[in-house]
Amino acid sequence: KSIMGEVLYDSEIAPYMGDWEGVERPRDYDMLAYFIEYGKELGMRVFGSLNVFAGGHNYFDRGVVYMDKAAWQSICYHNGKLTPISEIKTNYNCMMNPSNPEVQEYQIEVLKEFARKYPEVDGLIFDRVRYDGVTADFSELSKKQFEEYAGVTVENYTEDILSWCDENGNLRENWVLGKHAK
């Protein structure tokens, strides 16, 4: 599963990555099945690699976040503003919000489908099983979940978590942790 959330096999859940930079790959070509078969012939172990919470490539405006899953993308506190991660073009990876129950269920279904489809792989490598960084996720959903978990009301959102501005409202070069950051 690529950083775009597209997969290299025919899936009933995730979109198929049938082309990249002009190179087309037919839907009936199962790249992983080929690697498993040929790798086993050579006596190799074969692992599948899945980028779990990655949902798009910001340099190409491509991926599930750019298709029908825009609501699942992380909201970042970027340079003093709440910004959808797809709008931060200096960040190539468009991450989804790991705390969103819809995102979690979708990813679990992709992983279960993969495990059913390829039981003969020797293992799985999971990448991007995380938030994009300390500046993500600042969505209303994450705020609500944080308040419930911590048992607090965040009065000055986002500054009580993280601040880009000094006490005079001037933008800092780097963020500073707020009173609720842990």
Can you describe what each PLM-predicted range is?
Residues 13-29, 89-108, 174-182:
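The substrate-binding groove and active-site-proximal loops of carbohydrate-active enzymes
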